[in-house]
Amino acid sequence: MGDLMTGRILVAGVGNVFLRDDAFGVEVVRLLAERPQPPGVQIRDFGIRGVHLAYELLNGYDLFVLVDAAPRGEAPGTVSVLEVDMPGPEDPQAQPVIDAHSLTPDAVFGLLSSLGGHPGRSLVVACEPAEVDAGMGLTDPVRAALPDAVRAVEEILAEAIPGGRPGEGPEEGRAAEQATDEQECMADLATSR
């Protein structure tokens, strides 16, 4: 990924906590917010406030990481990291249909483009949902994917920022931290129930 110009990074979780696995992004950023982050990294829960997210991105970020549940035809709980190609202002995707309560990631990027914004590099850490019906709580396969998503975001940050883990160089302590990631995430989940 290389060095960032200003080091401003936004990691945004989106989703509806009342639609089971749609809450995946919200849960991941909740776990990340409890962990130390490198300077310049903002971890934010945008829930269903896609319009607010688009306006926040107008503030300028070198790297934007969106965490969301996204059906892609994979097995439930599969975590993927996707690079986003921003639509141009004339692109039909840049003319989103606005729903004040929720915007899909594509619509957020389209709204941002139509507002004249363009974050630096944009990535999506996506998880294949099992259920997005009305209900509270993640399904078992999606809950089990939380440590993988936390690790994916932390690896993105470590690659983007020299010494991207607090108090470490890029390689020091990485193996030990990865070994405990799953245990810490599961402990955090157990105490939040």
Label the predicted regions.
Residues 129-131:
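Short, internal active-site loops enriched in acidic
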Residues 2-127, 136-147, 152, 156-167, ...:
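N-terminal catalytic or cofactor-binding beta/alpha core of small enzyme domains
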